[in-house]
Regions:
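Short, surface-exposed polybasic-aromatic patches that bind anionic ligands, especially phosphate groups
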Residues: 1-356
Length: 356
């Protein structure tokens, strides 16, 4: 009466209308059965008495699945390697003896990671444009040939020695886009009281950081001084600018992999061991982190199963994930998930197709 059985030779069968059909894998069998049943061993004598049907199943469905955890994973990352990883026999960075290469894109499930924090950033190149990556996300920098572009880069701490990470646009999109940088149409006065820096306009004053004051001075703002009492007598007035508030230490390839975290902010991940080269067409080159089995994923726009080898399979609904036994094991934004190669959709209609 078991919906899924395994022969003494290891062949899986799934019951369809009282007929046992050979099936490619447990994922296909569970989808057909509509429940997260475990395969029960069936003896040869019982198998010989059973009605047998044609082989069915989805050939590229995940071979093994992780049971649903109490709390979904929420710390996936999409990364770029900045340099070739040195080969080591004790701690290879991928299976099969192949090493992670410079500029490879790697998607990782729950890696050890650190946010860029308030003091670190990354400079990236993508499709002829430079971007600043911070712990909050990404913002485009003004063109390098413009006055604003030169002023912003100098104040941020960008120079000829700063490493620019070359990002494909799909990986760039995994970082949350921040409001664009902008200077006031008419530069305000930059006032130094000795205790702080202020932007003064006819409407009033707004506080500045030293980095912002340097940028405004670089585009022609007049610099002057005043006493704290003179500033205190002026009204607060919003200033139409959006400029970085501080300079940064910029990431180099020696610092680790530069990554987009689950929430879209910048992060750093140490070079990871055991990543696997991805098969099929995808932006990502490698994947790692699901050694316990494939997981059900909620992308916020739909459901998928990601296999231990990094293939993503579309799933119709949460009920299918429950039937697979994974439930929602991870919450991963589509911007990261889409970097992986797409496998066959996991649904009952596809699973019931007779294989040739």
């Amino acid at each position: 009466d078991a919906p899924i059985v395994r022969s003494e030779q290891g062949q899986l069968f799934v019951d369809v209308n009282d007929t046992y059909h050979p099936v490619f894998n447990l994922a296909s069998a569970r989808i057909i059965a509509g429940q997260a049943a475990e395969a029960q061993t069936i003896g040869d004598e019982h198998l010989q008495e059973a009605l047998l049907g044609s082989p069915v199943g989805i050939s590229d469905a995940p071979g093994y699945l992780a049971a649903a955890g109490e709390t979904p994973q929420q710390r996936w990352a999409a990364c770029l390697a900045g340099k070739d990883e040195a080969p080591t026999t004790e701690n290879p960075t991928s299976i099969g003896g192949h090493q992670v290469a410079s500029q490879e894109v790697i998607v990782l499930a729950e890696p050890e990671q650190k946010s860029l924090g308030e003091e670190r950033a990354a400079l990236v190149d993508s499709e002829g444009r430079q971007w600043l990556i911070t712990q909050e996300g990404r913002v485009a920098l003004p063109d390098t040939s413009s006055t604003e572009g030169r002023v912003v880069r100098r104040a941020l701490g960008v120079d000829d020695s700063t490493h620019a990470w070359p990002l494909p646009p799909e990986l760039l999109n995994a970082f949350a886009e921040l409001p664009p940088l902008n200077f006031p149409a008419d530069p305000p006065e930059v006032v130094d009281t000795g205790q702080g820096l202020w932007a003064r306009t006819p409407e009033g004053i707004a506080e500045l950081t030293p980095t912002q004051a340097e940028m405004l001075a670089g585009v022609g703002a007049k610099e002057t001084t005043a006493t704290p009492q003179e500033i205190a007598a002026l009204a607060d007035a919003p200033l139409n600018l959006n400029l970085p508030s501080t300079s940064f230490h910029f990431l180099s390839p020696d610092d680790g992999w530069m990554c987009a975290a689950n929430e879209g902010g910048g992060a750093v991940v140490p070079a990871q061991a055991g990543t696997v080269a991805l098969a099929g067409e995808s932006v990502a080159h490698r994947f790692g982190g699901l050694n316990a089995g494939g997981v059900g994923v909620d992308s916020g726009h739909g459901y998928h199963v990601v296999s231990p080898t990094g293939q993503r399979h579309e799933v119709k609904d949460k009920e299918t994930l429950e039937a697979l036994g994974t439930g929602v094991g991870a919450q991963v934004p589509w911007e990261i998930l889409r970097l992986l190669p797409e496998g066959s959709a996991l649904n009952r209609e596809q699973a019931l197709q007779v294989s040739s």
